[in-house]
Amino acid sequence: MSGQNNVVGVHYKVGRRIGEGSFGVIFEGTNLLNNQQVAIKFEPRRSDAPQLRDEYRTYKLLAGCTGIPNVYYFGQEGLHNILVIDLLGPSLEDLLDLCGRKFSVKTVAMAAKQMLARVQSIHEKSLVYRDIKPDNFLIGRPNSKNANMIYVVDFGMVKFYRDPVTKQHIPYREKKNLSGTARYMSINTHLGREQSRRDDLEALGHVFMYFLRGSLPWQGLKAATNKQKYERIGEKKQSTPLRELCAGFPEEFYKYMHYARNLAFDATPDYDYLQGLFSKVLERLNTTEDENFDWNLLNNGKGWQSLKSRNAETENQRSSKPPAPKLESKSPALQNHASTQNVVSKRSDYEKPFAEPHLNSASDSAEPNQNSLPNPPTETKATTTVPDRSGLATNQPAPVDVHDSSEERVTREQVQNATKETEAPKKKKSFWASILSCCSGSNEDT
């Protein structure tokens, strides 16, 4: 198809931009074969921290798990890698904004049960997520059968905590660089300890308390450097008693946090016990999982989407005949990737669950047809942006974990029984003119 039609991956038409992150940009798209709406993620092929190939393989490994988006395509278009997945609704962070920066106990308990189930599914596939945050949990599309299902997305930081075949757990290690989002990461992660299932659970607990309280005690801390800021956040987490953190809320949230923080490094969590805690919260409220989340009760019961209808109408008018997407256009509804900040956005091969040697063949390094790419993007090195609500923001090159060069990682061959590769072959020419600039950094305050 011609470049003027904005078609990638043979039959995916690119629409408006709906988000961005340290990897690149996300666009809404349409499968021209069945008119299905999809999300199309772009990242520069020569990025310092390419992740879409690994993310594709993770989606394939998790295929069939409840609350995991379907993945449809991975391939290359000109100067970019692209990944096509299900188009979903807004993130829990977006919905928190709409609900006045706090959720009710009922909503948090219902959301917690779903979020915990998603993390359990990831753990059962021998993976740890390592970047738990509200921005990475999205609800389904409005008016769909799964509109109230909570999905987990963005698997750029996942890692095997055990061999998927032998089930042997990775060894305990220290002196690890931080990986994840400082606001929510576990205390052990701050202390440089290898992450395992317990750390995902503790980070989830921090998210639950963030939803209930509206903020966490370690937000808004200032320091001269990012490193010092992360240290201050870790110190504040350690010095804040759990009773104080959970004060004013049902006892079950304290029990959850106490359980997560006292798990052994290689212990298998009792997910049923944790699910039972939130079931007890709902029982005490004399309610059930009726899917009446706070965001569905907005605007006299019309729901969150009614608050966006005016903006959506404007967007539809602008995109009735969509031109080539432009980076400066923004979606008012889906900014989940624009509001996230990972402490580590670049990983060495041994930190990647499906690591393989970088391709150096002529076909991989060859420049695409410049006739089809009149405006190639400018390549820039990845940086990490750490703003806070006071307006302070600092940029610095994203740190690289250098402490695990001898770590034995799980290879791609070890999971061939779990998933089969169906990646699209590389194309020598792009179907359309490149419309992206290399995005670097993101902007979650810690």
From Swiss-Prot:
It is found in: Cytoplasm. The active site is at residue 131. One of its GO terms (biological process) is signal transduction. InterPro entries: CK1_Ser-Thr_kinase (IPR050235), Kinase-like_dom_sf (IPR011009), Prot_kinase_dom (IPR000719), Protein_kinase_ATP_BS (IPR017441), Ser/Thr_kinase_AS (IPR008271). It holds the Pfam family Pkinase. ATP binds at residues 18-26, 41. Disulfide bonds: none annotated. Residues 308-430 are annotated as: Disordered. Residues 332-345, 360-397 have a biased composition (Polar residues). One of its GO terms (cellular component) is fungal-type vacuole. It comes from the Eukaryota. Signal peptide: none annotated. Residues 346-355, 401-412 have a biased composition (Basic and acidic residues). One of its GO terms (molecular function) is protein serine/threonine kinase activity. The modification Phosphoserine is found at residue 329. It catalyses: L-seryl-[protein] + ATP = O-phospho-L-seryl-[protein] + ADP + H(+); L-threonyl-[protein] + ATP = O-phospho-L-threonyl-[protein] + ADP + H(+). Casein kinases are operationally defined by their preferential utilization of acidic proteins such as caseins as substrates. PANTHER family: CASEIN KINASE-RELATED. This is Casein kinase I homolog 1. It comes from Schizosaccharomyces pombe (strain 972 / ATCC 24843). The gene is cki1.
